[in-house]
Amino acid sequence: MKTPRLPIAIQQAVMRSLRDALARANLKLGRNYPEPKLVYQQRGTAAGTAWLESYEIRLNPVLLMENQQAFIDEVVPHELAHLLVWKHFGRVPPHGKEWKWMMESVLGVPARRTHQFELDSVRANTFPYRCRCQQHQLTIRRHNRVVRGETQYRCVRCGDTLVAEN
């Protein structure tokens, strides 16, 4: 799928959100943490990721185009919180008490771990598999591992090995 070209107005709104959240955090923490790099190259179903070592936030441009306000209000602060926690506390669990504190007490945003965005536009092709109790959809990566004989997948409900449907 071709990555959409993000209008400059959306990029500016995202940058404003990032800078506002960072300024709030720096004020409350009494620090002067630098501005992270923003990259619009996140793929798949993740809305965004925080890359600690390179101190950058990667955002999914497809989901951003479809959920602009939620990205500005929630996703940007969520990823920024990961970077700030890493700078402030070092390596800690990604959605642990430090991250929750950073989100709620410092950034003033509800600490939600996952998004609820519609994913049809970014969901990869899947392959139908079956067990005793239900149908499953495997990603192309998992399907190829089964085809090459590298692995078998089991249903968590009934324990059956999944078999490709024709």
Curated annotation (Swiss-Prot):
HAMAP family tied to this protein: SprT
Superkingdom of the organism of origin: Bacteria
All residue ranges annotated as the SprT-like domain in the record: 19-164
Keywords assigned: Cytoplasm, Metal-binding, Zinc
One GO term describing the cellular component: cytoplasm
Active site positions, chain numbering: E79
Location in or out of the cell: Cytoplasm
Gene Ontology BP term (one): response to stress
Cofactor binding description: Binds 1 zinc ion.
InterPro entries in the cross-refs: SprT-like_domain, SprT_Zn_ribbon, Uncharacterised_SprT
PROSITE patterns: ZINC_PROTEASE (PS00142)
Any single Pfam family the record assigns to this protein: SprT-like
PANTHER family recorded: PROTEIN SPRT
An example molecular function term from Gene Ontology annotations: zinc ion binding
Cofactor: Zn(2+)
Binding site for Zn(2+): H78, H82
Family of this protein: Belongs to the SprT family.
Protein name: Protein SprT
